[in-house]
Amino acid sequence: MKKIKQFVRDNEVVMQILSFIFNIPFMVKRYIKNIRRIPNIRCLGTFLWKVSINNFGKNNIIVIEKACRLRNCIINVYGDNNTIIIENDCELKGLNIWCSDGSKIFIKRNVHIVDSTHIASTEGKQIEIGERCLFASNTVIRNGDSQSILTLDGTRINYARDVVIGNHVWFGQNVTVLKGTQIGKDCIVGANSVLSGKCYSDNLLIVGNPGKVVKENVTWDPRVSR
């Protein structure tokens, strides 16, 4: 079975044929919506189950690369000149994407989302998620607040800022990552943690609200060691 899967992944034509066949019934039932309204969408070689893609603007680009598996996902794009790129071999379940006003979302290859994750990019800023990241359920990643916070003289103080997540980061359940946060590679973020506007280096265990480093020089493995 592993050899068959590897053959399919390595053969782009076979991947596209299989994904097209897989996706036909869901296109007919309109589980995949509004793709025709996005001329710059590419999702050949992907496997989509109950996926809704909604475009409310112009010049938006959505790329879902080969061997990606999306299930129960919603992608909403508002305004113009937005970019969403999901690289090869991602498995995303229950993902809700909001991208607006010339913003960008980059999800690198082999990212795994267990369920119910919300990613929102706004005000022309970007969110970047590195390779081989693992998200437990109910993760929230936002680079803006979607409303303005003002001083009494009318000065805004909560502009959106980029969020960057390095390769091979593991998020526990109910983690929230807010604007301006940068997380290095090989980090672990504990359940119910809130990270806001700080920069974290590589190989850290981060827990709490606000997120604090409780251990350094660590990494993680999806396999359970004995």
Question: Where are the regions a protein language model picked out?
Answer:
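Terminal amphipathic alpha-helical/low-complexity segments used for targeting or macromolecular assembly
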Residues: 1-61, 65-67, 132, 138, ...
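C-terminal/domain-terminus segments
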Residues: 182-207
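Flexible, glycine/small-residue-enriched loop-and-beta-strand segment within the central core
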Residues: 61-181, 198, 209-210, 216-218
